[in-house]
Amino acid sequence: PLLPYTTLFRSRLDILVNNASVFYATPLASLTEAQWHDLIDSNLKAPLFLCQSALSHLRATQGTIVNIVDIHAQRPLREHVVYGPAKAGLAMLTRSLAKDLGPEIRVNGVAPGAILWPDAGIPEKLEQAIIRKTSLQRAGEPADVAKAVLFLVRDAPYVTGQIIAVDGGRSVGW
């Protein structure tokens, strides 16, 4: 029911950014089915069905979809046996939708790296270890992700099916 409210407010839909996500560790030994559903539903299922709900509106406006993926869609994060595969699924969904929805709708993704730390926090030593693995030697800002999304939406009319890493160069040195 989100889309009817959105289109009622503005009467058209040009852009869908799938940014909602759940992130937490799921070690295999203690993984529950509820955790599986929580992570898959928020990181893969919800974006798919939001795209489906927005389809006719985005076709009418030659709109664009941007999915917020994660650099860990390509390289697993220890003890996150569900999150990584969910984001990898979102990366493949991004490419599949680009193939299926063109030429009317462009579909791309942005894969953030160290931008915001988990709500529960992580030890300072771990933060610094992650930052040392980036070429730019610093964490990013939410504005860095927003600028990449804005580029894909506004300045990239010939780009579809791509996922831009916004990770300070971390994925270069995996």
Which residue stretches match the model-derived regions?
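Active-site loop immediately N-terminal to the catalytic Tyr-X3-Lys motif
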Residues: 29, 75-81, 137
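Alpha-helical segment proximal to the catalytic Tyr-Lys
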Residues: 56, 98-103
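Substrate-binding pocket helix/loop in short-chain dehydrogenase/reductase
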Residues: 27-28, 35-40, 130
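Short, small-residue-biased leader/transition segments that mark boundaries at the very start
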Residues: 1-8
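Short, small/polar-rich loop/turn modules that mediate ligand/substrate recognition or access, typified
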Residues: 102-106, 160-161
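Active-site helix of classical SDR
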Residues: 51, 86, 94
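C-terminal substrate-recognition "lid" of short-chain dehydrogenase/reductases
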Residues: 57, 138-166, 171
